[in-house]
Amino acid sequence: MEALGPGPPASLFQPPRRPGLGTVGKPIRLLANHFQVQIPKIDVYHYDVDIKPEKRPRRVNREVVDTMVRHFKMQIFGDRQPGYDGKRNMYTAHPLPIGRDRVDMEVTLPGEGKDQTFKVSVQWVSVVSLQLLLEALAGHLNEVPDDSVQALDVITRHLPSMRYTPVGRSFFSPPEGYYHPLGGGREVWFGFHQSVRPAMWNMMLNIDVSATAFYRAQPIIEFMCEVLDIQNINEQTKPLTDSQRVKFTKEIRGLKVEVTHCGQMKRKYRVCNVTRRPASHQTFPLQLENGQAMECTVAQYFKQKYSLQLKYPHLPCLQVGQEQKHTYLPLEVCNIVAGQRCIKKLTDNQTSTMIKATARSAPDRQEEISRLVKSNSMVGGPDPYLKEFGIVVHNEMTELTGRVLPAPMLQYGGRNKTVATPNQGVWDMRGKQFYAGIEIKVWAVACFAPQKQCREDLLKSFTDQLRKISKDAGMPIQGQPCFCKYAQGADSVEPMFKHLKMTYVGLQLIVVILPGKTPVYAEVKRVGDTLLGMATQCVQVKNVVKTSPQTLSNLCLKINAKLGGINNVLVPHQRPSVFQQPVIFLGADVTHPPAGDGKKPSIAAVVGSMDGHPSRYCATVRVQTSRQEISQELLYSQEVIQDLTNMVRELLIQFYKSTRFKPTRIIYYRGGVSEGQMKQVAWPELIAIRKACISLEEDYRPGITYIVVQKRHHTRLFCADKTERVGKSGNVPAGTTVDSTITHPSEFDFYLCSHAGIQGTSRPSHYQVLWDDNCFTADELQLLTYQLCHTYVRCTRSVSIPAPAYYARLVAFRARYHLVDKDHDSAEGSHVSGQSNGRDPQALAKAVQIHHDTQHTMYFA
């Protein structure tokens, strides 16, 4: 076992090599949306491109380089078609006749109103060998050369980047022949994802259809009406109210608008604010001929300067450009600039509309991807840039053989100790009792739904049915609730819960009935989890009014887990050999606030198993240092869990208290890391885990296996044989595993689709092993991972990632609710600067600190 010192920088960090291929399971023929890329054994030439003025959007840079290549054809470029990435990297198939010298050129683009001149300098950087890349793909080299992969990526993206609107690794074009409004001035654009990936023996182009939300190009007045639900602008005869203005500001701040009152000169501006005063009252200092300044209203100015009588002088203005410059534009002369992606979080309704518009059954998606590639619509005829470099992309999906792993059997308890065998990722609890059910003697009900919506007889019927089902499940709720009252609003949660805790000794559970989406939920969890240490179970009023055995049974799954029960366990004899010695499973995740929400911090969560099954878990959670305080080169450390040593230490101590064993192995499943950051994150985290062990005992060195779990990727698997498709959506069966053909040429990774796809196309999870002291075989790790997907307490189905990784997400997500500030967040003030509601790091840390009575329970279930 290697000792981990402070060790090499991430760049030298070498993940373990693949220990061979898995063999367990029933073979299945599959197709993957990876398309083989043939590359010649040539060198390509890498040049640095420096464009002044800097900080122009990539779109402009591309135009500059495109113009430069045409303009300096005779002197420099000849017939070469360079690939360019929109920033500083350019690649050619043949060297430019400039040697190693820097060449300076001047390029003019026709601008809006006046032409723009750019100074461009080009200088040789290096020769990039595709021959080396081919050797790496054949498994002859330890590492895949990044520079060759980058060169290929830039070359294959060059044409689509000129032709479409790039977003990350995807390309979108404006809607033609379809229109999917999302409301609030947003609409769906369809496009495709493309990325080159090294695979066994070949480079692959991963191509997928994708969709995202864009802002509709429309007049700002219409945009405002959509955002504020104003049916007809003529009804809005008064100025906006404060709350309307705040809501409108939140949506429009940061967007680009273009003006319509200057004829062809459609100048573009970025919105920084919305004025409090209407255009008829908003003033600014107007410079007069004589050098003096006089206060002038925006409405007056537009009348004098443009002879434009404003139609809506009572509406506010947009403040654009830099805040200190006081540039104001009336709403009615502005349009939203086309092609702006929506990075703000979609509302619940928008998300559901989006899913309806974009979900495709697996066969439909397969058909759509094939059509896209074959029609060459992604390249609109043969791509001259690919041709230049002698690159050929095959237009058939890659065929491969996967395996369907056997599902584990699950042990239940009660008198008859039944065993459930999952079928297609699903099993049933009917006729079975929990492995260890909790007896509930003292419990309370608090109904926050109004009495007219949820009458007393409905409440009574609900509690009776819940008691019956709980008894069947082996978690008997004995007797009527000791307390059952109606309440209103988040403010009544704390006094009511305090009263309950003081009055009823041994109170085990509070069932809370909620009227739909409400701030009461966050408050119930804050008070229950962090303030008083009480178990709470929320239920939506619609599920009380219309009860189903399924819903009640699912409630019991959650309640039993929260109270320390065990729903079921993996049948011991079928578990992999890692269970022969004490082992702890850790799940870790970092969740970031939605884009455009710089005020909120990132949250890191780590959970650890607390028994040998593994079924019970304990959680630790921390607020990460805010992003502003981190310098640019350390930005990836935002992803690193900052207090990991202490978190793991707590979990190891707790494991020892629970089991009286010290784990000899630590299996760490890490979610929430993007591909580009894996190695930078893994190294410091491995050292932190090691430190946690050594801090307990100098020579305590359990073997660590570090696995990154990724769901956010574009690999999709399809059944080659139609008869193997499963369910309405025609997906691959649960348990489908792939560790060859489309996986890494030498590293230890695999795809596993552990869940039964219900809607749309299943997305297999990707697992990448970055460290392994425990010398897992492919079969052992794949089976272990699949079995852990069956141990998630909230449902009787296999889920898409292992339970520990899933729990870490739940814990981080719950901490978001603990951070909701009753006084600020619900009111949504207009512009709160700095960190989360101006609360300091200590206050944030305290807000997510779980009460000691709750700390060692699965409160997050």
Curated annotation (Swiss-Prot):
| SUPFAM superfamilies tied to this protein | PAZ domain (SSF101690), Ribonuclease H-like (SSF53098)
Stretches the record annotates as Disordered: 825-846
Q: Which stretches make up the PAZ domain?
A: 219-338
Q: Name one Pfam family in it.
A: ArgoL1
Top-rank lineage group of the source organism: Eukaryota
Q: What would you give as a GO molecular function for this chain, any one?
A: double-stranded RNA binding
One of the GO biological process terms: miRNA processing
Which residues are in the Piwi domain? 509-820
In its record, the post-translational modification comment is: Ubiquitinated on surface-exposed lysines by a SCF-like E3 ubiquitin-protein ligase complex containing ZSWIM8 during target-directed microRNA degradation (TDMD), a process that mediates degradation of microRNAs (miRNAs). Ubiquitination by the SCF-like E3 ubiquitin-protein ligase complex containing ZSWIM8 leads to its subsequent degradation, thereby exposing miRNAs for degradation. ZSWIM8 recognizes and binds AGO4 when it is engaged with a TDMD target.
Q: What does this protein do?
A: Required for RNA-mediated gene silencing (RNAi). Binds to short RNAs such as microRNAs (miRNAs) and represses the translation of mRNAs which are complementary to them. Lacks endonuclease activity and does not appear to cleave target mRNAs. Also required for RNA-directed transcription and replication of the human hapatitis delta virus (HDV).
| Quaternary structure (record) | Interacts with EIF4B, IMP8, PRMT5, TNRC6A and TNRC6B. Interacts with ZFP36.
Question: This protein is called what?
Answer: Protein argonaute-4
The gene coding this protein? AGO4
